[in-house]
């Protein structure tokens, strides 16, 4: 049961409420208490940072104080800020979330970076076809469509809720006419050929999920986390299907968990794909975006 948090914000100014909220979050041992407080306060009041500063002395209304208290209660209970707001920025673009989607993380931007790197290096077709497997909110696919004019993309997911969320994000970003979303397992409903296939598949070993942070294990969908006994179930299913549906010269890019990149490269090679460069690392130096090509006959 979510613990109740009293409302200490009624009658406070915006600046006083910010300090109170930050103190409460610090007391709950939340690492980014100051940043979380500013974001949650701004969301509750409909103000950006400039607005919070400009109106710092204004007293809160009763409704505003109630909203701030609700945000505080949810954050102290371990709910991520992005879940509370229902949105997260990825690749500089806003994405709505749902219970069926992961919160897009900066680590996954390495997949987008590697894809754009490959497109710059080769003479891609004027209308490249992209598939995003396990699309969730559509973050990877829609980021690529945003940056690759003329590309058309298909996102697949088992969750109808996730697909609805992805379609909504495509509409918001003005990319609905260049994207489609299909309910299926991996690439089962797709024929290809595709110039690029991308995926952030579930890769957490089943036994490790209870050890994840509260924010992840209680608020991210387990379908998008659980990679089976050793964490490689999704890769074993995805890679052979992707190899069959890649166009000659096309590339497959997948996100890897910590310590998984080398084993994934072995699976790629076993599917007759060519690993022609090292994985792209995230900001912590962990190899994340693992890629391979289907060589022309």
UniProtKB/Swiss-Prot annotation:
The keyword Acyltransferase does not apply. It holds the Pfam family PrmC_N. Substrate binds at residues 200-203. The keyword Transferase applies. Its EC number is 2.1.1.297. GO terms for biological process: methylation; translational termination. It is an enzyme of class 2 (transferase). SUPFAM superfamilies: S-adenosyl-L-methionine-dependent methyltransferases. Belongs to the protein N5-glutamine methyltransferase family. PrmC subfamily. This is Release factor glutamine methyltransferase. It comes from Bradyrhizobium diazoefficiens (strain JCM 10833 / BCRC 13528 / IAM 13628 / NBRC 14792 / USDA 110).
């Amino acid at each position: 049961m979510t613990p109740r948090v009293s409302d200490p914000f009624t009658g406070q100014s915006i600046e006083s409420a910010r300090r109170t909220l930050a103190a409460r979050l610090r007391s709950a041992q939340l690492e980014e208490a100051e940043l979380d407080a500013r974001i949650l306060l701004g969301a509750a009041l409909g103000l950006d940072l400039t607005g919070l500063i400009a109106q710092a002395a204004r007293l809160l209304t009763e409704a505003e104080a109630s909203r701030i208290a609700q945000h505080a209660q949810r954050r102290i209970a371990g709910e991520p800020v992005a879940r509370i707001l229902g949105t997260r920025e990825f690749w500089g673009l806003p994405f709505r979330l749902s219970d069926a989607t992961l919160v897009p993380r900066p680590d996954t931007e390495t997949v987008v970076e590697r894809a754009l790197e490959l497109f710059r290096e080769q003479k891609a077709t004027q209308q490249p076809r992209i598939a995003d497997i396990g699309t969730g909110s559509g973050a990877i696919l829609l980021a690529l469509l945003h940056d690759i004019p003329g590309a058309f993309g298909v996102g697949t997911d088992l969750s109808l809720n996730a697909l609805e969320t992805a379609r909504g994000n495509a509409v918001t970003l003005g990319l609905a006419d260049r994207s489609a979303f299909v309910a299926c397992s991996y690439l089962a409903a797709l024929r290809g050929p595709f110039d690029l296939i991308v995926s952030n598949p579930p890769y957490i070993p089943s036994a490790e999920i209870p050890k994840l942070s509260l924010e992840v294990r209680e608020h991210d969908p387990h379908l998008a986390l659980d990679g089976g006994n050793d964490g490689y179930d999704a890769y074993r299913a995805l890679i052979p299907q992707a190899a069959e549906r890649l166009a000659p010269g096309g590339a497959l890019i997948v996100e890897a968990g910590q310590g998984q990149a080398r084993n994934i490269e072995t699976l790629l090679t076993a599917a007759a794909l060519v690993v022609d460069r090292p994985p792209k690392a995230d900001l912590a130096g962990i190899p994340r975006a693992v890629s391979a090509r289907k060589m022309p006959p």
